[in-house]
From Swiss-Prot:
PROSITE patterns: ABC_TRANSPORTER_1, ABC_TRANSPORTER_2, PHNC. The gene is phnC. This is Phosphonates import ATP-binding protein PhnC. The keyword Ribonucleoprotein does not apply. The complex is composed of two ATP-binding proteins (PhnC), two transmembrane proteins (PhnE) and a solute-binding protein (PhnD). SMART domains: AAA.
Amino acid sequence: MSADSRAEVVLHAEAVTKRFGATLALDAVSMTVHRSELVVLLGLSGSGKSTLLRCFNGLHPVTSGAVTVAGTRVDTAPRATVRALRRDIGFVFQQFNLVGRLSCLDNVLLGGLARLRLPRYGALTYPKRMRAEAVAHLDRVGLADLAHRRTDTLSGGQQQRVAIARTLMQRPKLVLADEPVASLDPENAGVVMDLLFRICLEDNLTVVCTLHQVDLALGWAHRVIGLRDGRKVFDRPAAGLSRDEVMAIYQRAEVTRSAPAGLAAGAL
């Protein structure tokens, strides 16, 4: 990662708090993510990971705090501005969100819809250059030979790779991936994480990914941010972060008050 990439802030969250009625889902979470970083939000189900992602793209309005993406304040911008900003924010879902009856190529092309003037009447047609771009993205994820196959005939790992190709077709500045490997076997999980990592390196894209698998986080992330009960427990470079330190977020709150020295108050 170059110094220039490190200097460019793509995402900044300042004391983000989110309540759903009486339930506190996020408690004053702050973080900064730079261009070309792959940052993993790690924690158990209910720790606030997915809620935080949806605060980043404005799907969940924050209760208090501030979210800035690519220079735009998501929490205070007009709705039309936030909708336009979402064109620059790709989202990779746990359950793929593909149209099963469509081919892989047609699903990837959907990622470029925002760049087209939609016809009032008649069928939607894609320019040759867009179709070539979509095939190139499928080739990048290793599925160009399946371009015309229906996505509902693919394995889970293949479907997630199509979903990543669709996200790349969007030409995003930020990619949010919500538990993208939760339903995959270990081999396919590694393939998907490798794709996300290569996107960061080769395209200078920023990826924020939620996971609950410690080994995947340590193996692929530039930084790991641990969440527990809606609070940030640590924010550390993955290099040098031990598995034992990370496992602190899976312990009960009363136990983790006496966490290892690496997670003492000064390191949180």
